[in-house]
C-alpha cells in the first residue's frame, strides 16, 4: 500500500512539473543587466527541456491561456518587471496558473516580501523546484493589485510621474513629481465607507483606531457596522510593504481574506512630515490621528479631484470601489540555484 501511495504522489508531482514557461517582460521596466538575465533564463530553461518564450504582449499571453488544446496544467509565467507588471500578468491569468516574479522595477515590493530573485539561475531553480502557494489580491475599480492602493498626496506624486515618465524609473526620478505635488496639492478630505455584507465574519471586522497596547485579535470583536472614515491620507494594504521601506501597516497579511486600511486624518506639509517621522520611528500607530480597519469591501470618495494609485501605478480619480479577492493569485515558492 505504501509503495502504491508513493507512486501516486510521484505521478502527481510529475503531472504538475512545469514544462512550458512564458516570460512576460515590461518594455518600460528594467536595465540592460536585467535584460541579460532574461536571455540567460531562456537559455537555462531550454537547456533543461522546458519550452520557453518571451513576450511583451498580454494579448498573446491571453490567447495562449485560452488555447484548450495546449492546456495549462504544466504551464507557468515569469513576470519580469515591477509590481505593476506582476499585477497586470495576474489579472490576465486564471488563479491556478503559477507566476514567478522576476523583479526589475524600482521598488519590487512583492518580490522583496517573498524574497524572489532577479538572477536567472534562481528563477530557473524556482520553476523547477518551487512549491505552489496562494495569496490574496485586491481589486480597485476593476484593476487588480497585489500590494496596496492609496489615495491622496502620495498618489498625486505617482500621477506626476505618470505624466512625465520616459522609460525606466529610478528613485531620483521622483524628485520633480514630489516638488510639483507639494506646490499644487490641496489635501481634500477623503471618505472611506465600508461595505459590510452578510458574509463578513464578526470576529474579523472591526475598528483598529489608534493602535494602542490592545492586541490585534482582541480589537477585532463583534463590530459589524463601522462608520465612515474621513482623512486626508487613505491607504489599504494587502502586503505590509510601502515604497522606501516604510512600514506604514506592519500587520497586513496577504492570505487572510482582508485588506488593512490605514488613514491619517490631517493634511498639509507639516502634518505629513510629522506622520513620516513617526512612521520611521514606528510610533505612528499610537497617534490619535491614525485609524485602522480590516475590511473586505469599501468605497473611497472625495469632493474634489483626488487621484489614487495601485501598486505604484497611477489608476485614476476617486471615487474608487475596492475589494479583496481571496486566494486570487498562485506563486511558486522561491528557490536558490
Task: Say what each PLM segment does.
Residues 150, 154, 235-248, 314:
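Glycine-rich phosphate/pyrophosphate-binding beta-alpha loops
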Residues 79-83:
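N-terminal glycine-rich "phosphate-gripper" loop used for MgATP/nucleotide binding
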Residues 1-77, 87, 199:
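ATP/NTP phosphate-donor binding region
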Residues 165-172, 242, 250-270:
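Gly/Ser/Thr-rich active-site loops/lids in small-molecule metabolic enzymes
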Residues 46-48, 55-56, 63, 95-100, ...:
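Catalytic core of DAGKc-family lipid kinases
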Residues 85-95:
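Short Gly/Thr/Asp-enriched flexible loops that form oxyanion-binding sites at enzyme active sites
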Amino acid at each position: 500500500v505504501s509503495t502504491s501511495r508513493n507512486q501516486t504522489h510521484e505521478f502527481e508531482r510529475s503531472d504538475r512539473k512545469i514544462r512550458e514557461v512564458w516570460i512576460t517582460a515590461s518594455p518600460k521596466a528594467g536595465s540592460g543587466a536585467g535584460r541579460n538575465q532574461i536571455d540567460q533564463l531562456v537559455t537555462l530553461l531550454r537547456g533543461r527541456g522546458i519550452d520557453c518564450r518571451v513576450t511583451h504582449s498580454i494579448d498573446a499571453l491571453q490567447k495562449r491561456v485560452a488555447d484548450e488544446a495546449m492546456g495549462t496544467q504544466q504551464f507557468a509565467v515569469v513576470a519580469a518587471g515591477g509590481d505593476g507588471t506582476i499585477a497586470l500578468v495576474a489579472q490576465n491569468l486564471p488563479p491556478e496558473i503559477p507566476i514567478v516574479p522576476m523583479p526589475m522595477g524600482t521598488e519590487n515590493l512583492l518580490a522583496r516580501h517573498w524574497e524572489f530573485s532577479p538572477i536567472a539561475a534562481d528563477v530557473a531553480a524556482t520553476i523547477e523546484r518551487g512549491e505552489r502557494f496562494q495569496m490574496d489580491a485586491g481589486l480597485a475599480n476593476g484593476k487588480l493589485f497585489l500590494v496596496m492602493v492609496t489615495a491622496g498626496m502620495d498618489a498625486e506624486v505617482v500621477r506626476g510621474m505618470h505624466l512625465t515618465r520616459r522609460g525606466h524609473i529610478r528613485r531620483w526620478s521622483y524628485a520633480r513629481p514630489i516638488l510639483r505635488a507639494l506646490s499644487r496639492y490641496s489635501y481634500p478630505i477623503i471618505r472611506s465607507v465600508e461595505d459590510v455584507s452578510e458574509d463578513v465574519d464578526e470576529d474579523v471586522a472591526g475598528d483598529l483606531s489608534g493602535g494602542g497596547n490592545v492586541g490585534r485579535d482582541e480589537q477585532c470583536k463583534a463590530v459589524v457596522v463601522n462608520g465612515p472614515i474621513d482623512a486626508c491620507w487613505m491607504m489599504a494594504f494587502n502586503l505590509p510593504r510601502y515604497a522606501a521601506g516604510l512600514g506604514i501597516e506592519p500587520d497586513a497579511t496577504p492570505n487572510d481574506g482582508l485588506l488593512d486600511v490605514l488613514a491619517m486624518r490631517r493634511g498639509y506639509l507639516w502634518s505629513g512630515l510629522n506622520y513620516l517621522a513617526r512612521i520611521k520611528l514606528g510610533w505612528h500607530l499610537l497617534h490619535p490621528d491614525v485609524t485602522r480597519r480590516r475590511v473586505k469591501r469599501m468605497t473611497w470618495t472625495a469632493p474634489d479631484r483626488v487621484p489614487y494609485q495601485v501598486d505604484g501605478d497611477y489608476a485614476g480619480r476617486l471615487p474608487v470601489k475596492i475589494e479583496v479577492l481571496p486566494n486570487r493569485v498562485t506563486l511558486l515558492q522561491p528557490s536558490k540555484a
